[in-house]
């Protein structure tokens, strides 16, 4: 794949994230890289103090460094900043870090030599995963500690995470000395010159990669939420009137309009919907009898005299809630796409006039705010799903058997499965607290306001896992609810979703172990199987327009 600095698309970043895509730098970037490197070389040979070239760092910026020590200065910088702790970052995150750092440096405003970019791409293309601890960055001045660990591996002093056989690991494996791994792959360890160490660790590539990692992981989960939410509407015999396009056009919120469209398409052709329309009493009319033949005991109660005027919010307001979440994800995807293409080094080198300007592009506040928006959206998708589960098991609202058990009392049904969903939804509410509003001064108050973007993005993965489990429980519950409406059928799309679950999870006429069923369904939610059901529907709007990812 051709890496075009400043012009990366989100679907290209997704391909990098997925792996197996060798990267080649656009040759058009080379002149700019050479020009900015010449400016740095001249500064290193000159008498003027230039931050990051011949001075100390942070609070020590006023300390002048002798010319003979400039290379050692950069090496010391990397070694001293390798202070991360915690679990290793996953391989997809490292792939994005390597690629976006190479693309940023290749913009030609960092003053590094081409060999720096070449080494980043060589490590990426070899499938190597530098060992980078996940904790230790406050998101300004850049993601210093994690990028230092990544850089140390390029120098042959750090570590790579590999399989026992010596093959690159997909985020798991054993840690091996970087020098040996580079030698096995015939990659020369990088030797730093003036400013290059600073350029490699000053930037927002870790927090951006973590946020992209979450964005890509949540896409199939959100698609699953739409399908499962629609299945719940049918299981509860909810109305499809709230999805009428005229309602949503009057508000004009794009995510809401698109989500309502999805629900209409998912519910189209449902025999349950049609029977609901036939059985709902008209104003002033008495109860109508249930249809003859094949009526189950609970079905007769459902069909006979369904006098509900409005559905609960968890059914009726799904376009408003999930649509707003979709809008936030679209906003975040735009921020992250710009950040992945950005130059977030400091100081910046402008070869056209030889200027080297100190600024603050390393401050990851845009990423922090985008990640916080994603956290709220992720939490809300899970929160409304938990409410739908609660509605399904409450027979006074859903008019299904209590806890979706035909012999409630002897059987507890989905009683405690809902408790698990409530627990996970509560966890997400706590984790959704905005990280960006927190700041602690560092570097003796020189770096006195920071973004906390790295944590803001890193906490998204466990939140997504929680939502996937909540949706898995809802899927099980909604499918069980559909069983009580047989022989009526849902729409073709929703019957496909029901059948997909039934391939590994049978109906539950009596109590049994549910935990394996939850894990099975959660794997399908994560894996995009329900998104495939959604994408097969004709005429759907693209959910990921801003991300240049179409359904």
Residue ranges and their predicted role:
Residues 1-21, 25-32, 36-44, 70, ...:
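C-terminal auxiliary extensions adjacent to catalytic cores
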Residues 109, 138-140, 409:
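Conserved, non-catalytic sequence blocks in retroelement Pol enzymes and Pol-derived host proteins
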Residues 1-47, 77-133, 233, 248:
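Glycine-rich, flexible loop motifs
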Residues 51-73, 80-103, 133-155, 172-174, ...:
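FAD-binding core of FAD-dependent oxidoreductases
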Residues 118-125, 145-148, 152, 223:
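A broadly conserved amphipathic alpha-helix scaffold signal in soluble, globular proteins
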Residues 48, 63, 259:
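Polyanion/phosphate-binding surface patch
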């Amino acid at each position: 794949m051709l890496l075009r600095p400043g012009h990366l698309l989100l679907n290209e970043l997704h391909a990098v994230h997925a792996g197996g895509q060798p990267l080649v730098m656009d040759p058009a970037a080379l002149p700019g890289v050479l020009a900015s490197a010449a400016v740095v070389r001249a500064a290193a040979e000159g008498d003027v103090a230039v931050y990051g070239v011949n001075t100390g760092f942070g609070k020590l910026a006023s300390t002048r460094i002798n010319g003979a020590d400039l290379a050692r200065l950069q090496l010391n910088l990397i070694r001293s900043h390798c202070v991360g702790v915690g679990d290793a970052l996953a391989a997809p995150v490292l792939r994005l870090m390597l690629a976006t750092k190479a693309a940023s440096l290749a913009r030609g405003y960092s003053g590094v030599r081409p060999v720096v970019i070449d080494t980043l791409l060589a490590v990426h293309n070899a499938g190597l995963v530098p060992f980078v601890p996940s904790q230790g960055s406050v998101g300004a001045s850049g993601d210093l500690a994690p990028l230092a660990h990544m850089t140390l591996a390029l120098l042959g002093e750090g570590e790579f995470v590999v399989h026992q056989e010596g093959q690159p690991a997909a985020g798991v494996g054993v840690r091996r000395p970087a020098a040996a791994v580079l030698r096995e792959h015939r990659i020369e360890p990088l030797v730093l010159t003036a400013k290059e160490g600073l350029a490699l660790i000053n930037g927002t590539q870790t927090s951006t990669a973590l946020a992209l990692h979450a964005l890509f992981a949540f896409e199939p989960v959100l698609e699953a939420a739409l399908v499962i939410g629609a299945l719940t509407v049918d299981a509860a015999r909810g109305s499809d009137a709230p999805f009428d396009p005229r309602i949503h056009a009057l508000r004009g919120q794009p995510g809401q309009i698109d989500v309502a469209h999805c629900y209409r398409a998912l519910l189209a052709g449902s025999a349950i919907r049609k029977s609901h329309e036939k059985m709902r009493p008209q104003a002033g009319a008495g109860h109508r009898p249930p249809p003859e033949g094949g009526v189950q005991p609970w079905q007769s109660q459902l069909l006979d005299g369904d006098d509900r005027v409005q559905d609960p919010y968890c059914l009726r307001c799904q376009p408003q809630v999930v649509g707003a979440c979709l809008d936030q994800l679209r906003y975040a995807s735009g921020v992250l796409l710009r950040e992945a293409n950005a130059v977030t080094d400091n100081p910046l080198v402008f070869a056209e006039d030889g200027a080297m300007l100190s600024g603050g592009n390393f401050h990851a506040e845009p990423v922090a705010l985008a990640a916080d928006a994603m956290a709220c959206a992720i939490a809300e998708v899970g929160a409304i799903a938990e409410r739908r589960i609660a509605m399904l098991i409450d027979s006074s609202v859903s008019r299904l058997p209590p806890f979706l058990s035909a012999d409630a009392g002897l059987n507890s049904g989905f009683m405690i499965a809902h408790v698990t969903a409530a627990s996970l939804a509560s966890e997400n509410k706590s984790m959704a607290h905005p990280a960006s509003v927190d700041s602690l001064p560092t570097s003796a108050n020189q770096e006195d306001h920071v973004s906390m973007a790295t944590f803001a993005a890193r906490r998204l993965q466990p939140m997504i896992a929680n939502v996937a489990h909540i949706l898995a429980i809802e899927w099980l519950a909604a499918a069980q609810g559909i069983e009580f409406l047989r022989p009526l059928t849902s729409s073709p799309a929703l019957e496909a979703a029901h059948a997909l679950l039934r391939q590994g999870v049978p109906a539950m006429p009596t109590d049994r172990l549910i935990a394996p069923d939850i894990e099975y369904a959660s794997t399908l939610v994560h894996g995009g199987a329900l998104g495939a059901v959604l994408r097969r529907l004709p005429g759907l709007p693209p959910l990921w327009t801003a991300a240049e990812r179409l359904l």
